[in-house]
Amino acid sequence: MLLATGEALRGERVLLVDLDQQGDASYSLVSDYDPSKTSYELLTSESVQVPAVATPVSGYLNLDLVPASLTLERVEVELAGVLDAQFILSDKLEAVKDDYDLIVIDTPPSLNVIVSNALTAADKLIIPVQADIYSFKGMATLAQRVKAIQRRSNPRLSICGIVLNRYNPRTNLSKAITEALNEVAEQFNTKVYRSTLRDATAVREAQNAKQSLFEYAAKGAKVTEDAKALLNEIEEDLKNG
């Protein structure tokens, strides 16, 4: 969500597609939306296209959201046996790519057909990792999935880097995880972004207030400066291809 809101505030036309059934991004951006117009319908109904489920986000001139739904948990079953199911999202985003400067896809942590759709549709991948030991579980499997997608369905997919989230520089654990992340980055043939997002109350307060971190914590919170620095790094990667 940080990338989508940050770029929208900088004047880019942005579409955020929330594919995580927890819907954290959706909850943080909109108070209410039509439960029949979500990313679930986008993935499971052949006739539903992006404009039918994209919701303008209040407070932004140029940010649209395809919200998540709890019914996303049924996608795996409903798309079982569907020919070329991993291309559904790619085909539908292709139809609106000229309407936006940037399309951001928020995915669940599990490796399923939803994530395969996202990886097949994406040009670039940014991997967020929380500063705890459990976040490293499944990273090797993700690396294998990415390589398989690059080989079979999306050769243009590249990995921009890994973002360390909820970082506390005062703990030995966070320092150890930072060192371990460099080894993880080698698996993906990528880098760890220099800018980290520290663990801060302002992040959760911003979500509860349904504001972006840039708006809510503009009062001087250090995590806002983290976010701006990270956004600048990511922007540079996007511009350089």
Which residues are covered by each model-predicted region?
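P-loop NTP-binding core
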Residues: 1-241
